[in-house]
């Protein structure tokens, strides 16, 4: 009989940072090591990554990392895992291996070849890893040759799928092998772990609403000049559709992303796309072309930065022309609405025709009927929805009821909560891991906490005020000089002068209150210094709130000389 634990380091009640752990007896399998790109409200934070402490403590039991759909949300933290913990065998598809190796090369990680162990699995070929047999199978997702995994245990199968749609097209790049794996595991599936996708947000099947060929072909056929199309690098389906149209309309084709060029070349090498008669040009030739289809693609944070640079004529390779057309193919994401509007404003300011297809074309994720098909075919005893917000999980549960699934069968753990299944039954004993996710900024890895994120939010909304006070440790006295800086604080010059005058009065009062104490002690002690800085911060914050109704971040510093 099997003892099974499932828990998440990320991906539960959030979209991104997917990292899930499956313990089967003494074997540990990790699915995804992703990252989360926060909205612009979190100033200076490039990405948020999982806490790897548990992995470090249990690394001897870890049999491998499984990557079915190699997108940023699933592989964005691999480099940090390598640096902080070490290397583990990675099991993925041939395409997944290319994406992972490209990321490693991009990040300039000096990893010896004998330490980086990537196993390219063949679909429907069972392999024994640790003490368990695992069968990968192809699913139709946004990246060609994406995998799901079926793990065999003494109590039945555990089926893991990131994203999928039910698709019966003859496109081998997005082949669907659900019909082959279902007979093997149907009625024997103990647990289905699946991404929540569009379940609860889109009734029916996702197909054919994910297809963009007809709309794109019509737009591009009427375009007078070059066509720029922006999409995430996880959307290989759309990039390949654009390449197909370039071939059909005899237009030059270029992908403005060195990393995605590697992926596209791998897709061609694997004979997943026929590039015969496709006129590809280099990135350097974009401005020389008059009618090229230019794909602008990158992970979310980098893509928006790239689009901003192009829109403001700061990009070194691309300049918009009045004859150009721009197609925005990015799905709307909460927190990015302002960015989207600004990018489209920049495009319009350059007198470029634009089309926003982000709301018209569905992402390649399971909708209600896709998920109902999978669940009714597998008949799992338990289901764990992943990679979504809590409301998504509630909607998922309601849709599953329509498929005849009892509410008690749908298990919704949050990050760190351990779900235990012993001898085919849920163990109701509560257990939780304490997690401390990390954020990555320009200085590297940082601890993350509510206070840190609040301060970054303050900086983005109202700016920063720095105050520097100087203390002569030899004479045990404060100098008269006080240095102020207003960074990102929107105030006119008159108000700044008034504020500085009031601030100086407040600060000198704070200093005078402790002068006698420091004279007696003959030095500025650590506790006194901290007390003074906190007191100044509080007083200046109150002053700002009263005079300006703003609440910038106040940073007070005492320098001993």
Curated annotation (Swiss-Prot):
Coiled coil: none annotated. GO terms for molecular function: metal ion binding; RNA binding. SUPFAM superfamilies: Metallo-hydrolase/oxidoreductase. It is found in: Cell membrane. GO terms for cellular component: plasma membrane. This is Uncharacterized protein MG423 homolog. The chain crosses the membrane at residues 29-49, 80-100. InterPro entries: RibonucZ/Hydroxyglut_hydro (IPR036866), RNase_J (IPR004613), RNase_J_2 (IPR042173), RNase_J_C (IPR041636). PANTHER family: RIBONUCLEASE J. It comes from Mycoplasma pneumoniae (strain ATCC 29342 / M129 / Subtype 1) (Mycoplasmoides pneumoniae). It is a multi-pass membrane protein. Keywords: Cell membrane, Membrane, Transmembrane, Transmembrane helix.
């Amino acid at each position: 009989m099997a003892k099974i634990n499932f828990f998440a380091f990320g991906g539960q009640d959030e979209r991104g940072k997917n990292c899930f752990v499956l313990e089967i007896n003494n074997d540990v399998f990790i699915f995804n090591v992703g990252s989360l790109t926060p909205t612009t409200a979190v100033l200076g934070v490039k990405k948020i990554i999982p806490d790897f402490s548990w992995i470090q403590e249990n690394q001897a039991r870890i049999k491998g990392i499984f990557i079915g759909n190699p997108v940023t949300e699933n592989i964005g933290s691999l480099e940090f895992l390598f640096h902080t913990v070490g290397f583990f065998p990675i099991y993925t598809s041939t395409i997944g291996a290319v994406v992972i190796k490209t990321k490693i090369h991009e990040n300039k990680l000096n990893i010896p070849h004998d330490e980086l162990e990537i196993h390219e699995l063949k679909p429907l070929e069972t392999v024994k890893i640790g003490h368990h047999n695992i069968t990968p199978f192809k699913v139709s997702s946004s990246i060609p040759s994406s995998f799901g995994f079926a793990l065999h245990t003494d109590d039945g199968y555990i089926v893991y799928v990131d994203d999928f749609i039910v698709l019966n097209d003859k496109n081998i790049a997005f082949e669907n092998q659900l019909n082959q794996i279902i007979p093997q595991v149907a009625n024997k599936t103990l647990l289905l772990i699946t991404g929540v996708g569009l379940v609860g947000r889109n009734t029916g099947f996702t197909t054919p609403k994910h297809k963009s060929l007809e709309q794109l072909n019509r737009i591009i056929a009427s375009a007078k000049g070059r066509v720029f199309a922006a999409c995430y690098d996880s959307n290989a389906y759309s990039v390949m559709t654009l390449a197909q149209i370039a071939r059909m309309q005899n237009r030059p084709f270029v992908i403005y992303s060195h990393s995605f060029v590697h992926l596209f070349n791998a897709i061609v090498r694997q004979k997943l796309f026929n590039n015969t008669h496709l006129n590809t040009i280099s990135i350097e030739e974009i401005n020389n072309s008059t009618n090229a289809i230019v794909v602008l693609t990158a992970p979310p944070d980098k893509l928006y930065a790239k689009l901003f640079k192009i829109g403001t004529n700061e990009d070194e390779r691309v300049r918009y022309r009045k004859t150009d057309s721009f197609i925005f193919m990015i799905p709307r994401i909460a927190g990015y609405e302002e960015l989207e509007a600004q990018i489209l404003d920049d495009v319009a300011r350059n007198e470029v025709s634009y089309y926003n297809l982000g709301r018209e074309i569905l992402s390649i994720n399971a909708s209600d009927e896709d998920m109902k098909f999978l669940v009714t075919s597998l008949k799992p005893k338990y289901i764990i929805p992943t990679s979504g917000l809590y409301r998504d999980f509630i909607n998922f549960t309601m849709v599953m009821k329509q498929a005849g699934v009892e509410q008690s069968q749908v298990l919704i753990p949050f990050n760190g909560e351990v779900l235990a299944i012993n001898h085919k039954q849920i163990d109701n004993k509560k257990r939780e891991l304490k997690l401390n996710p990390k954020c990555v900024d320009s200085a590297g890895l940082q601890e993350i906490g509510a206070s840190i994120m609040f301060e970054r939010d303050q900086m983005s909304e109202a700016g920063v005020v720095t105050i520097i006070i100087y203390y002569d440790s030899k004479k045990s006295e404060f100098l008269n000089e006080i240095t102020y800086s207003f960074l990102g604080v929107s105030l006119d010059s008159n108000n700044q002068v008034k504020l500085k005058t009031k601030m100086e009065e407040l600060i000198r009062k704070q200093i005078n209150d402790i002068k006698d104490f420091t004279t007696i002690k003959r030095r500025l002690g650590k506790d006194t210094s901290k007390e003074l800085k906190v007191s100044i911060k509080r007083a200046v914050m109150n002053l700002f709130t009263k005079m300006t109704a703003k609440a910038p971040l106040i940073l007070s510093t005492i320098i001993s000389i």
